Amino acid sequence: MAAPAIYQTDKVLRFEVPGSRRPSTYFFALVLTLGGLGFLFAGLSPFVETNLLPFSDTRGLTRFPQGVTMIFYGALATLFSLYYWLVLALDVGSGYNEFDKQNKKVTLFRRGFPGKNRIIEIVHPLENILGLKVQIKEGLNPRRAYFLKLKGARDLRLSPVGQPQPLAAVEDQVSAIARFLNIGVEGI
């Protein structure tokens, strides 16, 4: 996963946070769509007494239980694929982290699902920042996350959710933020 784009001036530091538009999400959406439609057409073939799949022979399938079961699994996979395509279209989870010395604030912006929380924007004054916290866990389920420590509030996650970023990207971003805000880093 590539490091998010950086926009930096002497007054503003901005990191783009990638959302759901990753190659793995496109892959799963495509596989679920093709597999779900394949199962759906295979399950419907015994009911319409026509082979709806030109690359396969469905004459051996019976209406019950095989046809009904394949229709059920095909419909379920198609619904899941619709969810994936919706998440991709809305780019859920994408946004930016912006540190603004001129307006003396930090802004965390993310896109969500339609409704009350479609746009998530968290703004804190720079004076409330205590430092950065880094959590690095290697092994079978690696975790590489960094948080903004705030006075009187819980830690805010700055790193993207999903696949862990490369260690070099985490170090670059954390050091850029720490240098820009002149704050300390704990956990390294």
Swiss-Prot record:
Please give, as recorded in its UniProt entry, the membrane topology of this protein. Answer: Multi-pass membrane protein
Top-rank lineage group of the source organism: Bacteria
User: Which keywords has UniProt assigned to this entry?
Assistant: Cell inner membrane, Cell membrane, Membrane, Photosynthesis, Transmembrane, Transmembrane helix
Q: Where in the cell is it found?
A: Cell inner membrane
Where does it mainly reside? Answer: membrane
The membrane-spanning stretches of this chain are 27-47, 70-90
Any GO CC annotation of this UniProt entry = photosystem I
Q: What Gene Ontology terms for biological process does this UniProt record contain? A: photosynthesis
Q: What does this protein do?
A: Seems to be required for the assembly of the photosystem I complex.
The family assignment reads: Belongs to the Ycf4 family.
UniProt cross-references to NCBIfam families, sorted A to Z: PRK02542.1 (NF002712)
Kindly provide the name given to this protein in its UniProt entry: Photosystem I assembly protein Ycf4
